[in-house]
UniProtKB/Swiss-Prot annotation:
Cellular component aspect of the GO annotation: cytoplasm
Cystines in this chain: none
Cofactor annotation remark: Binds 3 Fe(3+) ions per subunit.
InterPro entries in UniProt: Ferritin-like (IPR012347), Ferritin-like_diiron (IPR009040), Ferritin-like_SF (IPR009078), Rr_diiron-bd_dom (IPR003251), Rubredoxin-like_dom (IPR024934), Rubrerythrin (IPR052364), RUBY_RBDX (IPR048574)
Co-factor(s): Fe(3+)
Start and end residues of each Ferritin-like diiron domain: 1-146
Function according to Swiss-Prot or TrEMBL: May provide oxidative stress protection via catalytic reduction of intracellular hydrogen peroxide.
Domain of life assignment: Bacteria
Rubredoxin-like domain ranges (all copies): 153-191
Positions contributing to Fe(3+) 1 binding: 20, 53, 97, 128
Binding site for Fe(3+) 3: 158, 161, 174, 177
Subcellular localization(s) per the UniProt record: Cytoplasm
Species of provenance: Nitratidesulfovibrio vulgaris (strain ATCC 29579 / DSM 644 / CCUG 34227 / NCIMB 8303 / VKM B-1760 / Hildenborough)
Protein name: Rubrerythrin
Length: 191
């Protein structure tokens, strides 16, 4: 691959790296808040997403060739709010990344002859779209009071011990390990 030095793509990589790195930290902070708010599954989703953002940043960082590079970029300077607000803010950031930032960065990389980097930008955008959907789905569940309650009987799994409960809602305490309702999630069987 030809050198990135002085290209717009080099600046875009560093901008995306900085954004992914900051998102990782925000998601770790938001995960802590979710746990405080009684949403262990959402806390774990924030942690998982933070790890995925770290991997995006690492992939991008490996393209850089060293030295100092000045970029001008705006990043969210928000606060740690309640879990619902944190999910909405996170979804907005992911939306920007997959609808505007990464498609633009991929186009510029192609124009400058960096096809591999363009593919990476486009691939990261796919992950960001999934992140947005998941954040919005959890936000909707909080707003509608559906995190631990459903109209139809379903199966709920304790994330701490694996106990499975069937009913319209998660139990207040797990009968197997005595952990609170915060540790339950809908049982998802994807194998």
């Amino acid at each position: 691959m030809k050198s990135l030095k002085g290209s717009r793509t080099e600046k875009n990589i560093l901008t995306a790296f900085a954004g992914e790195s900051q998102a990782r930290n925000r998601y770790n902070y938001f995960g802590g808040q979710a746990k405080k708010d009684g949403f262990v599954q959402i806390s774990d989703i924030f942690a998982e997403t933070a790890d995925q953002e770290r991997e995006h940043a690492k992939r991008l960082f490996k393209f850089l060739e060293g030295g100092d590079l000045e970029i001008v970029a705006a990043f969210p300077a928000g606060i740690i709010a309640d879990t619902h607000a944190n999910l909405i803010a996170s979804a907005a950031g992911e939306h920007h990344e997959y609808t505007e930032m990464y498609p633009s960065f991929a186009r510029i990389a192609r124009e400058e002859g960096y096809e591999e980097i363009a593919r990476v930008f486009a691939s990261i955008a796919v992950a960001e779209e999934f992140h947005e959907k998941r954040f919005l789905d959890f936000a909707r569940n909080i707003k509608e009071g559906r995190v631990f309650l459903r109209e139809q009987a379903t199966k709920w799994r304790c994330r701490n011990c694996g106990y499975v409960h069937e009913g319209t809602g998660a139990p207040e305490l797990c009968p197997a390990c005595a952990h609170p309702k915060a540790h339950f999630e809908l049982l998802g069987i994807n194998w």
